[in-house]
Each structure stands twice: as C-alpha cells, then as structure tokens.
Amino acid sequence: MATTATCTRFTDDYQLFEELGKGAFSVVRRCVKKTSTQEYAAKIINTKKLSARDHQKLEREARICRLLKHPNIVRLHDSISEEGFHYLVFDLVTGGELFEDIVAREYYSEADASHCIHQILESVNHIHQHDIVHRDLKPENLLLASKCKGAAVKLADFGLAIEVQGEQQAWFGFAGTPGYLSPEVLRKDPYGKPVDIWACGVILYILLVGYPPFWDEDQHKLYQQIKAGAYDFPSPEWDTVTPEAKNLINQMLTINPAKRITADQALKHPWVCQRSTVASMMHRQETVECLRKFNARRKLKGAILTTMLVSRNFSVGRQSSAPASPAASAAGLAGQAAKSLLNKKSDGGVKKRKSSSSVHLMEPQTTVVHNATDGIKGSTESCNTTTEDEDLKVRKQEIIKITEQLIEAINNGDFEAYTKICDPGLTSFEPEALGNLVEGMDFHKFYFENLLSKNSKPIHTTILNPHVHVIGEDAACIAYIRLTQYIDGQGRPRTSQSEETRVWHRRDGKWLNVHYHCSGAPAAPLQ
C-alpha cells in the first residue's frame, strides 16, 4: 500500500526562533531562511484544531496575501502546509505599531498625520485595485517596517479580508472592529470597498486629535452614533486643524457609501498630495498626549476582554458567601480600572461622550464559565475584533443571558419573574418528576411556594461551558452543566450538579423557555 509523503519544506528551509505573538489557533515566531539567512515572521496555524470553514478562511487569507505586493503592505513570501500545521511566512516588521511610534516622537504635526494617512491610502488603493476589501482597518493593523526614522507604514492582518467583484456591493457578513465599522455594515446592507474608506476616516480623525469620532461604553449607543454619522469637531482641539483636513474627514465619513470618497480620489485630495503647502506644520502636543491615553485604553481593553473570556459574573438579589474566583477578581479590577480611565475628563476626548452605563465589580452569584467553542475564542490576536460570526455570537450571548436571568429567578424564589421568562405550556423532563413529562407551571409553582421562596440561605450557581445552537431566527437551544452551591439544614456547605438543556422560542421580540430537560441531581437544593 502506497503512503503519501509528508511535506517538510518549512522545517527543511527555515529555522524557528522566539515567539512574537499568539492567537487562539496560531503563534507568530521569528524565523530565518537557512539558505539566505534572511529574517521573516512565520504565522504558524495549528490546522488540527480548525473546522472546515476555518480551513477555507485560511486558504482565502493566503490567496489574498499572495496577490498583494506593495511597499505599504506586509508581504507574504511563502505558504506551506505540513502535517498538522500551516506556515505563512511574512515580512518581519520590527517597528511596532504606528500609533505607539507617534507618541514617542518629539515633534508631530498635521503634516505628519497627512504623511501617515497617505501611506495607508496607498495600501488601501492597492488592495482595492485587486478587488480586495480589508474589513479590519484599525491602529493595531498599522505597523512600521523598522525602528528607523521615516520607516514605511505597513498594513497587516488580512484574516478578515474578502474578494469582491469590482464595485459590486453584497452582504459578506458582519465583520470588523466596533469603533471602525461603517453604517452600511451596521445596517446589514450590501457593502464593498467603501467600508475601508470609512475606517480610514476614523483613523485620520484619531491621528489629528488623539481620540475617536465615535465612542460610547455601550456598544448599542456606539452603533447608533455611527449609523447617524454623529461626530463633530469640538473646540479647542479642532480649532487648530486646517479646513482641508476636516473636509477630507467629512468625505471619508459620508454615511452614503455611494457618495463616499474613494482611495484613489483621497490620494488626490490637496491635504494629502500637497501637504507641504496645505497641512499645518504646528506641533500638536495635546494630540500626542490624548493619543497616549487612547493607546493605553486600547491595550487595557484588550486585556480586560481576554480576562473576561475566562469568567463573567452576574449579580443576583441575595448576598453570597462564595468568594470570587481569581479570574473573576481580575476581571472586576480590570473593569474598575477601565471605568476610571474611560471616565477621566482628560481622557482623549471621551469627555464629549460620557456613557451612563458603568462597569461594576459584581458579587459572584451566577457565574458563567465559557470554553472556547461558542464563537468566543480566547485570542489576544483578535480580542478587539468583531469576528465574521458576530451576528451569531450576539444571539448566542442573548440566549446565555436570558438563561442566567431564569436561574436567578429560581435562586431568588421569584415565581413571578420565572413565569415571565417561561412559556405557560412549558414542558420538562426533570428528576423531581421521576422521569415523567411535565407540562405547565403548576409543578414548578409547588417548589417556588414551599421551598425556594422560604430559602434565605446563600445560593451560588455556576453555569459551565454553555453551548448554544441557534435554530433559525426565533429559536435556540442551550446545553450546560449547572453547579449549585448551598448551605443545608445543618449549616453544612453542599454542591449539587445537573446537566440541563433548555429550548427557547422568541415571540413578539421576547424569548420564552418552551422546553427544559434536566438530568442528575435535583436542581432545587434540598434544605
């Protein structure tokens, strides 16, 4: 029987060195080509962990990167598949992020911002000429070729990039990073190349004053701002910016994508192509200071999101004696730090749009511990990125949240709240019913009236690894392990475990639990 020879071209041709970065399924390491001693950055993807769809995305990224050869784009030099791993060999860019470099400069002017956006537009124009849309233009993906003064800006990370048909618009899914998403993507309209120009407009705005045009702690409010194109040029920081710079921003942040300036047109704008005579040369110290805070906030937000993937905590009415886990404490402390940083008046223009929502350090009454399977990947590589499955992820989070609310109602002995979340004809299989199918609320009402409502002892519930299956627009199923900690009648701590499945149906915009299946120990702790 013939055997297929395993490819070892990467292992044979390249020597690996230190790690440069890490993601959910990939790691980036410095490597050297043995024959030339040339240094590169190798993105190593563990293909054993990839789904069929992930494989398609990987192939698409490699195909797109092979097409693009431009001095302002991180170039792909090689793409090699070996047993269990795929290697993408890129330029080794050593200058770090553009935004981090700016804050280290002694002098930074509007003309410098013009030079930066010029290079970014050159890269965007190149990819658009090849019918590629990046979809994730943001500061994290704008790198410098080296640490030398005047090093080229390079556009990186084509993981969300797509191939389009010329100027044709279509719905390619919800992808990007919240503050840089265009109105048409948020409206779920067909879209194309103009989404990259919108993101360039956001980046240019930040380059000039150090804070973003759209901001709110509440993502829904942020999206409303973007869809309305609700940005302005507040005094005093914008008073020293030339009208030509504001004009270019206005043309980039045009709500109607058909009327938005193109990359080619933007490169011909006087503020870009005649910067020496049009752009101001005045040093912008306040911009540098605001940008420093903006950078700190970006990094902190990434750390918080990564921490919160480990453990999310939700508050219920009763006080619990159960201590917060280390991950929960870290998430809470990070949340407090974020709140402090975000609400400071001096924080890079956020003063203009303070959110009424806030981050609280919560008592751990109902804890949800996710694994990395439900569209929530523990990736520091994309923790600030909305994935292509964002729509699905949001709906899954909605189901997890309503399940938490239902369990909180049970823990609180609140039958009224319970009935508002459950269908009157709720069917259930559960240990308390001795394997019989129960229909309606009366069976559960007995426990609420005679056990749960009389229970004054602390209860702490942990939902482990919730798996959500979305079934069409208005139905979903969630399966999880539920651990319930409680104090028994003798004052001793106890834990019960049950494996639960709930089927949810949305009617008139409201989710109702229509079926419940529980195995293991009774969910209601016996006193």
Swiss-Prot record:
The active site is at D136. Residues 283-292 are annotated as: Autoinhibitory domain. Induction: By cocaine in cardiomyocytes. One of its GO terms (biological process) is regulation of postsynaptic membrane neurotransmitter receptor levels. The modification Phosphoserine is found at S311, S321, S325, S329, S355, S453. It is a peripheral membrane protein. It catalyses: L-seryl-[protein] + ATP = O-phospho-L-seryl-[protein] + ADP + H(+); L-threonyl-[protein] + ATP = O-phospho-L-threonyl-[protein] + ADP + H(+). GO terms for molecular function: ATP binding; calcium/calmodulin-dependent protein kinase activity; calmodulin binding; identical protein binding; protein homodimerization activity; protein serine kinase activity; protein serine/threonine kinase activity. Pfam families: CaMKII_AD, Pkinase. Residues 14-272 form the Protein kinase domain. Its EC number is 2.7.11.17. The modification Phosphothreonine is found at T287, T306, T307. Residues 294-316 are annotated as: Calmodulin-binding. ATP binds at L20, G21, K22, G23, A24, F25, S26, V27, V28, K43. One of its GO terms (cellular component) is calcium- and calmodulin-dependent protein kinase complex. Residues 344-389 are annotated as: Disordered. Keywords: ATP-binding, Calmodulin-binding, Developmental protein, Differentiation, Kinase, Membrane, Neurogenesis, Nucleotide-binding, Phosphoprotein, Sarcoplasmic reticulum, Serine/threonine-protein kinase, Transferase. It is found in: Sarcoplasmic reticulum membrane. The CAMK2 protein kinases contain a unique C-terminal subunit association domain responsible for oligomerization. Calcium/calmodulin-dependent protein kinase that functions autonomously after Ca(2+)/calmodulin-binding and autophosphorylation, and is involved in sarcoplasmic reticulum Ca(2+) transport in skeletal muscle and may function in dendritic spine and synapse formation and neuronal plasticity. In slow-twitch muscles, is involved in regulation of sarcoplasmic reticulum (SR) Ca(2+) transport and in fast-twitch muscle participates in the control of Ca(2+) release from the SR through phosphorylation of the ryanodine receptor-coupling factor triadin. This is Calcium/calmodulin-dependent protein kinase type II subunit gamma.
